[in-house]
Amino acid sequence: TFNLLESCRKFFYSLDVEKKSKFIFHHISTDEVFGSLGEKGRFSESTPYDPRSPYSASKASSDHLVRSWYHTFGLPVIVTNCSNNFGPWQFPEKLIPLVTLKGIQKEPIPLYGDGCNIRDWLFVEDHVDALLLAALKGKVGETYCIGGYGEKSNKEIVLKICEILDNEIPNQTPHNKLIKYVLDRPGHDKRYAINPSKIETELGWKPKYGLEKGLRKTVLWYLKNYDWCQNIFKKGNYRLERLGK
């Protein structure tokens, strides 16, 4: 992030006045920088930072760097913090493609801890629409939180994927019989949820897909594009496991 900011600062300073007026550094971040929620409430642009993992701490530091380049050097920036993305083409180690592909292959489906950790799921095309609006119509120096109104526990997501697979691959043992509870991930935050009212009110964004429609589209994509996943397995050492901590 530091290198990108410095390169963009130098480039920005080299532009004429007209081109400077059209320049923006759009920093795309995560809701994990805000920490973990209790049973109620949602993250917003005014939520204090409380990162609880090495990953979220690094993302939080990059957010602060971006804002410091804005305040110190006048670099025009916009920051967006999004909830959990999903959709076609996502690398198989993430929860939704991992569960889908495990189900297709009739392999055990891992579910961390008690499966009750909650995430706010955002379909990738809805996220892209929000990013374009923020970049083209957002106010310089502002932050916009992007969430999909898709709060579900990991267990609920896994069961829904199993239900879709049962409908698409009938006459087999129900896919939920493949679920296997495994040791929880270190530092596994309990709940994330975003209040996207600012970007809705100020920029007119609304999710078009939502969780149910987006999840079905995603599972069907992996069913139809299984060869794409097989190529990933052939070209590397990845074998459908969660990566990182």
State what each model feature region is.
Residues 1-85, 125, 131, 217-245:
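N-terminal Rossmann-like NAD(P)+-binding domain of SDR-like oxidoreductases, especially those catalyzing
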Residues 30-33, 84-90, 116, 136, ...:
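Active-site proximal helix/loop that lines the substrate pocket
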Residues 36-38, 89, 155-157:
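Short glycine-/acidic-enriched loop or helix-start segments at secondary-structure transitions
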Residues 41, 92-100:
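A glycine/serine/threonine-rich, flexible loop-to-helix segment
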Residues 61, 65, 69, 99, ...:
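Hydrophobic alpha-helix immediately C-terminal to the catalytic Tyr-X-X-X-Lys motif of short-chain
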Residues 72-76, 92-93, 138:
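Short coil/turn segments at alpha/beta junctions that flank glycine-rich nucleotide-binding fingerprints
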Residues 97, 103-245:
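C-terminal substrate-binding subdomain of Rossmann-fold SDR/epimerase-dehydratase oxidoreductases
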